[in-house]
């Protein structure tokens, strides 16, 4: 495994660890999720280029489309929660709270 793949896998693991550690704030969770998506995009692009799969060049583009949709929905949810509650805590999303 080349060193760039190891670095990208470490970036993915660091983003996942950040997602687990900073899961109380929505903004931190969204940033870690974007880091995970970016490392998945780079890794899939490098894999496709190294293996020379000519039929699967659209997979990284599809991954970017899903990442953009996830970012837009996440930011809309962040704005909604911060407008309603004044904080970006994920526990504010619990509908069973009184």
Curated annotation (Swiss-Prot):
It is an enzyme of class 7 (translocase). It catalyses: a ubiquinone + NADH + 5 H(+)(in) = a ubiquinol + NAD(+) + 4 H(+)(out). It is a multi-pass membrane protein. GO terms for molecular function: NADH dehydrogenase (ubiquinone) activity. It is found in: Mitochondrion inner membrane. The chain crosses the membrane at residues 2-22, 29-49, 61-81. Its main location: mitochondrion. GO terms for cellular component: mitochondrial inner membrane; respiratory chain complex I. InterPro entries: NADH_UbQ_OxRdtase_chain4L/K, NUOK/Mnh_C1-like. Keywords: Electron transport, Membrane, Mitochondrion, Mitochondrion inner membrane, NAD, Respiratory chain, Translocase, Transmembrane, Transmembrane helix, Transport, Ubiquinone. Its EC number is 7.1.1.2. GO terms for biological process: ATP synthesis coupled electron transport. Belongs to the complex I subunit 4L family. Core subunit of respiratory chain NADH dehydrogenase (Complex I) which is composed of 45 different subunits. Core subunit of the mitochondrial membrane respiratory chain NADH dehydrogenase (Complex I) which catalyzes electron transfer from NADH through the respiratory chain, using ubiquinone as an electron acceptor. Part of the enzyme membrane arm which is embedded in the lipid bilayer and involved in proton translocation. PANTHER family: NADH-UBIQUINONE OXIDOREDUCTASE CHAIN 4L, NADH-UBIQUINONE OXIDOREDUCTASE SUBUNIT ND4L. This is NADH-ubiquinone oxidoreductase chain 4L. It comes from Microcebus jollyae. The lineage of its organism: Eukaryota, Metazoa, Chordata, Craniata, Vertebrata.
